[in-house]
Amino acid sequence: MTAVKEERQHALLSASSAHRWLECPPSARLEESLPDTTSSAAAEGTIAHALAEIKALNYFYPADMSKQKMSRRIAKLKKEELWNDEMQGYTDVYLDFLKAASIEYPSKPYVAIEKTISYDNYAREGFGTADCIMIGGNTLHVIDFKYGKGVEVSPENNPQLMLYALGAMDVYAMIYDIQHIKLSIVQPRTGNPGWTWELSKEQILLFGENVKHVSALAWEGKGDYNPGPEQCRFCRAGDLCRARAESLMDLEAAENMLPPLITWDEAAMYLRRGNGLVAWYNKLKDSALKEILSGGRVPGYKAVSGRTTRVWTDRDKAFQALNDAGYPDTVLRETKDLSISQIEKIVGKKEFTELAKDLVVKQPGAPALVP
């Protein structure tokens, strides 16, 4: 957990933010000028990563992480406010992947868990924490555990994992002749038990050469701003970035198009350019409200009280008074089934599957437009 925090605090060109600064070099320094905030989802992910680390260490290094020590560590994690029992099942999926990956080697591989990796040869003062690194023969395997479920992450051309691979090749060059690289992401909450992409030493080194040029620009805060859905999604400067605002607002140029009805080719262009417009607008509104509430000024806007709601001051006492007046609970309360996901969360994924696997079907979702 500490290593993750250090990366956020000190690595300007961090591996976890590489998908931003490699696409939009000036964004690294721009983000540096803004306060970093941690969402509840990120905090939840930190707990899940700590649990995954404990389990992996117990399996690969039981002398250092005995069952007793593991139990004590997990008991401590369970006291965290955002702890959820379903983390146990999801981290087991990750551990199963690590076990399977390790036995693919002809002999026992070297395994590093939560390894701090420097790739300073490619990006100045760049480092990050790799969840798991395995090396055996001439094969390097970088494995990353993702606890998020909102956005599925692919290992293919994944800059975070590729930077870890470059750093690992430098660190272990004197011991291993690495020629083959595997990059894997385990993201169980999206239904992904493990997705692997493979590349050669030549391919990863070519990526590294490209990184050197872009990272030099990013370090100096130079280069061109390049707004886009992927790099802007989690950028701290995303809602106030001038380049992004101008890119999105250029959609208003439609009035110059003739004839009055746009073609489907033009519609496709607007769909691409408008991707992220609503999310950006809502984030901008939130930032403006925070500015006003903190004493700042946003011309033409003010903060007002939202819609009022009524709440009980003493719910139990209120219901007792209503019961005494002749209104039973059957009138005052609703009874409804929990959703399948809620029931699975209570019962546990494994037991739920055993009890109800033949009684649950997946209905096709409504059609959705994707690029």
Tell where the protein language model's regions lie, with residue ranges.
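Short acidic (Asp/Glu) and glycine-rich catalytic loops that position anionic groups and cofactors
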Residues: 25-31, 143, 184-195, 236-237, ...
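Hydrophobic/aromatic-lined pockets within catalytic cores
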Residues: 56, 60, 147-150, 165-173, ...
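Mg2+/Mn2+-dependent nuclease catalytic core
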Residues: 106-219, 344
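Active-site-proximal structural scaffolding
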Residues: 125, 157, 228, 267-273, ...
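Short, charged, low-complexity amphipathic alpha-helix
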Residues: 205-276
